[in-house]
UniProtKB/Swiss-Prot annotation:
Enzyme class, broadest EC rank: transferase
Induction statement: Expression is repressed by microRNAs miR-15b and miR-322, repressing muscle cell differentiation.
Tissues in which the protein is found: Prominently expressed in the heart and skeletal muscles and is also detected weakly in the stomach, small intestine, and colon.
PTM annotation, UniProt: Phosphorylated by GSK3B, which is required for recognition by the SCF(FBXW7) complex and subsequent degradation. Ubiquitinated by the SCF(FBXW7) complex following phosphorylation by GSK3B, leading to its degradation by the proteasome.
GO cellular component, one term: chromatin
Descriptive protein name: Actin-histidine N-methyltransferase
Gene3D superfamilies from the UniProt entry: Rubisco LSMT, substrate-binding domain, set domain protein methyltransferase, domain 1
Enzyme Commission code: 2.1.1.85
Comment on protein domains: The SET domain specifically recognizes and binds actin, suggesting that it does not accommodate substrates diverging from actin.
Null mutant phenotype: Mice are viable, but females display severely decreased litter sizes due to primary maternal dystocia (delayed parturition) that is refractory to ecbolic induction agents. Cells show complete loss of actin histidine methylation.
């Protein structure tokens, strides 16, 4: 995944001799752990906390300078070894080559014509680095004792990667040597580059990512220095923050979810070769073939010899791409911003609104999304706004009588308004809310566009400003769209136009409403509304595995850089509080601490 792989040349094949004592670092990491485990700061104090944590991290990094294990030469020097290793172990290596595409970084280029839906790439399980292979590695003894590693597959995978990188004879060395030496995730941003994200919706996730990564490093530094099962780890003599940041980013930008060998559950994996593919808009074309026990990818479209081969990572917003993958995707057809809405409990009609929403499968308070495409809202949000703006009489119509179920059934469909007045109210409310969100930014759209013309702007600052600009453009578009809809329905109200009524024969219309949803509404994929890919239900995932006719696991959540299972939170920044306590207790308690 070259776009998130802008690299600096790696310089040495071994770790340098330590110039700082483990005890000194242990004292600093204890201070860092205490700072990162403090209660969340009050609103307006997040930046202050971030800079304090960053100062401690930078102090540790300075003392550890030169201690990390790296490799001689450039990343691309190892590509031939990767291809040879992949070929010898059953992966496909014909029809493509690894090339530097400049702005997009390294990716795959077709060396022959490839037809759409043609199977062109497969990687057998033995080549994958997984949580399962971590358990069977030198990390196994510590994994068996540490509840945090057991509860968080992404962290286990990061340590697996670090241990194998530090082992010259590792089976995965041909793969690890081709990984970037650094990334463009916010963990690598300079303070001024992070400052470009201030006032954006993404900044809170950036703060959380940085804080949690620092907390995890501090916790595991103590574990590695003091836990008896860590004695044989190749990290014992040198485990730097730089190492951990690299491993976390490598996993965060590349991880994917695959079924275990028996297909009964899912596990996290790094997939060599395939993870070189860059992203474009489209559909998921990668799955897992249980019969042949390999990851398979079919072509997203026709590719001619010389074309870059793209895959689709999933319906990610640009905030997700920047934070978890380290790149901004121009013309992202799935870009969106979050909007938090809820019915106030002080609302006189709260009980009735809550009941209508419950029947539609919608919570009284949630995070929805405003989309970059038309319409800017989904069926879920439309239904919520309609209920939010209902009069007492309209609420009664949705709760009582023979037609109540039909009214619930059509709540999220644009073809069947509750009333013209209700439509005017909801679009007016949305227009006002989006306008207020726009006013929270410290710069205007025009100012951001001017800044982006600066040729001296760093790659990461450019990403940050593009993200900031993109959020505002989506909000501005939502304001304009809401205004148009408001006037459209106001005209209908003034003209006393008859309301369309639902009949069973109209069922086909329900698939073409806002968000192209099938109603009645159920609480589905609110993570998409929030712009966050939430945890896949384990049972849901397993059922997908078993139901796949050809043994492929494929779908929106089975994508690089962000699939989840119940027991495996994908991105380290999403973990909550790591404490300095010894690893013990139930898995549930560990998850609460993390």
């Amino acid at each position: 995944m070259g776009k998130k792989s802008r690299v600096k040349t790696q310089k040495s094949g071994t770790g340098a001799t330590a110039t700082v004592s483990p005890k000194e670092i242990l004292n600093l990491t204890s201070e860092l752990l205490q700072k990162c485990s403090s209660p969340a700061p009050s609103p307006g104090k997040e930046w202050e906390e971030y800079t304090q944590i960053r100062a401690l991290v930078e102090k540790i990094r300075k003392k550890q300078k030169g201690l990390s294990v790296t490799f001689d030469g450039k990343r691309e020097d190892y590509f031939p070894d990767l291809m040879k290793w992949a070929s010898e172990n059953g992966a496909s290596v014909e029809g493509f080559e690894m090339v530097n595409f400049k702005e997009e970084g390294f990716g795959l280029r077709a060396t022959r014509d490839i037809k759409a839906e043609e199977l062109f790439l497969w990687v057998p399980r033995k080549l994958l680095m997984t949580v399962e292979s971590a358990k069977n590695s030198v990390l196994g003894p510590l994994y068996s004792q540490d509840r945090i590693l057991q509860a968080m597959g992404n962290i286990a995978l990061a340590f697996h990667l670090l241990c194998e990188r530090a082992s010259p004879n590792s089976f995965w060395q041909p793969y690890i040597q081709t990984l970037p030496s650094e990334y463009d995730t916010p963990l690598y941003f300079e303070e001024e580059e992070v400052r470009c994200l201030q006032s954006t919706q993404a900044i809170h996730d950036v703060f959380s990512q940085y804080k949690n990564t620092a907390r995890q490093y501090a916790y595991f530094y103590k574990v590695i220095q003091t836990h008896p099962h860590a004695n044989k780890l190749p990290l014992k003599e040198s485990f730097t923050y730089e190492d951990y940041r690299w491993a976390v980013s490598s996993v965060m930008t590349r991880q994917n979810q695959i079924p275990t060998e028996d297909g009964s559950r899912v596990t996290l994996a790094l997939i060599p070769l395939w993870d070189m593919c860059n992203h474009t808009n489209g559909l998921i074309t990668t799955g897992y073939n249980l019969e042949d026990d390999r990851c398979e990818c079919v072509a997203l479209q026709d590719f001619q010899a010389g074309d870059q081969i793209y895959i689709f990572y999933g319906t990610r917003s640009n905030a997700e791409f920047v934070i978890h993958s380290g790149f901004f995707f121009d013309n992202n057809s799935h870009d969106r911003v979050k909007i938090k809405l809820g019915v106030s409990k002080s609302d006189r009609l709260y009980a009735m609104k809550a009941e209508v929403l419950a029947r539609a499968g919608i919570p009284t308070s949630s995070v929805f999304a405003l989309h970059s495409t038309e319409p800017p809202i989904s069926a879920q949000l439309l239904a919520f706004l309609r209920v939010f703006c209902m009069t007492e009489e309209e609420l009664k119509e949705h709760l009582l009588g023979d037609s109540a179920i039909d009214r619930i059934f059509t709540l999220g469909n644009a073809e069947f308004p509750v009333s013209w007045d209700n439509e005017v109210k909801l679009w007016t409310f949305l227009e006002d809310r989006a306008s207020l969100l726009l006013k929270t930014y410290k710069t205007t759209i025009e100012e951001d566009k001017i800044v982006l013309k600066n040729p001296d702007l760093s790659v990461r600052a450019t990403m940050a400003i593009k993200l900031r600009l993109g959020e505002k453009e989506i909000l501005e578009k939502a304001v304009k769209s809401a205004a148009v809809n408001r006037e459209y329905y106001r005209k209908h109200m003034e003209e006393r136009a008859p309301l369309p009524r639902y009949e069973e024969s109209d069922l086909g219309l329900l698939e073409g409403g806002v968000g192209d949803s099938r109603l009645p509404l159920v609480l589905r994929k609110l993570e998409e509304e929030a712009g966050v890919q939430e945890s896949l239900s384990l049972t849901e995932t397993v059922s997908k595995v078993k139901a796949a006719e050809n043994g492929l696991v494929n779908g929106e959540n089975l994508i690089p850089n962000g699939t989840r299972s119940e027991n495996e939170s994908l991105s380290p920044e999403e973990s909550e509080n790591v404490t300095g306590e010894e690893s013990s207790g139930s898995m549930a308690k560990v998850k609460e601490r993390l």
